[in-house]
Amino acid sequence: NFDGTQLYEYDSDVGHSEWGTCNFNYYRREVCSFLNSAAALWMEVYHCDGIRMDAISRALYWQGDPARGVNEGAVTFLRNLNHGLNDRWPTGVYMAEDSTNFLKVTAPTRYDGIGFDYKWDMGWMHDTLDYFATPFGQRPDAYGKIIFSMHYFYNELYLLALSHDEVVHGKKTIIDKLWGTYEEKCAQLRTLYFYMYAHPGKKLNFMGNELGHFREWDEKRELDWDLLKYPFHDAFQKYFGVLSRLYATQPALYAGEYDPRCFEWVASESRDEGVYAWLRKGAGQTILCVMNTQNTAHKKFPLYLSFPAGAEELLNTEAPCWGGTDKSKPKALHTSDGGVYGRDYTLTVDLPAMGSRMFKLTPEAPRPEAAQASARRAAAARRKAARTQNARADAAAYNSKK
């Protein structure tokens, strides 16, 4: 404020944020030019791979409060900024950290969107960490936290992030947030990251997450590389690498991850057992992901599928090579006839405590009797639908005569 007036910020009560910093006045062209130049500097001079913009809700809404209305000047600025960045550096990745329900954050600007490539899924991050911090006995009541993210996931192009924000300022590191003893934390950490990589959406992790770091991040010192002298942390780093390679080499885990047709729940009501299972589909491949979040093992747990298949294990988070306790040897599994919920086939799997398993499914020809039973059920469903349609037509005709 060289002459006593505001230079970059507003001159009213919206001039400062809740953190005491100034809010830029996006209605002044010189301010927008300054911010555009700052973003371009990171891309052109420092050759960054992309830009992540923090707390954009404070720009989208006045003081970050939807009740105060949309800041149209900020919306226009963000659209122009993203359009310019994508035009000059089309391979860059431009991300928004936003905890609001503002629409079209990741829609292209030509469709009146804000133009970001991805939006951080803050809800997924909070719900996941809250769930894994919950004592085992209380997890049935929190079961829905793991399911909830898929209710809104396809509204935007979401990115799953466990970033620097989650390992500073007394929040504890990822592994230290988890409930239980040291051994239980270690097992659950493998399952938490299994869930992250098997969940639709791009992934982002902060340095040190791959080590199972117990000390919070400190910008004044390097990571605790000595942790790799300990068996769990050394094994976890290797596990993290294998998990990342699985994500990169199994098309079903990334192809179509923003297409709702490529995801299907298999088990989402096993609250007492703490079991979740889902299918990922893409590029002609189907992968079954099964997660046990309780500290008790489940033998011969039934999973119901709509097609007969063989199952080849890709990953077991409780394998001894990762420090796990499941010493069983991988073997090919096959569905059996019979099921529930309109699914005609059952795959039975053993689930270690706090462990997860991933299978590649190969469709098999249905047995004649199973195919006939399925055809009979389909025919019965068609007859029921026809009766319902006829009844509605009769009711409409009757009402029209009244």
Residues of each region from the PLM?
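Core domains of carbohydrate- and sulfate-ester-processing enzymes
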Residues: 1-17, 21, 134-150, 323-324
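Substrate-binding/active-site clefts of carbohydrate-active enzymes
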Residues: 1-70, 333, 382
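Aromatic/hydrophobic pocket-lining residues that form the small-molecule binding cavity
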Residues: 32-35, 39, 74, 78, ...
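Conserved alpha/beta catalytic core and glycan-binding cleft of carbohydrate-active enzymes
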Residues: 47-49, 61-220, 248-303, 307-317, ...
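Catalytic cores of secreted or luminal carbohydrate-active enzymes
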Residues: 232-253
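Trp/Gly-enriched beta-strand surface patches
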Residues: 309-341
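C-terminal beta-strand-rich structural cap/linker in extracellular carbohydrate-active enzymes
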Residues: 330-371
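Short, low-complexity intrinsically disordered segments enriched in A/P/G/S/L with frequent Arg
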Residues: 395-396
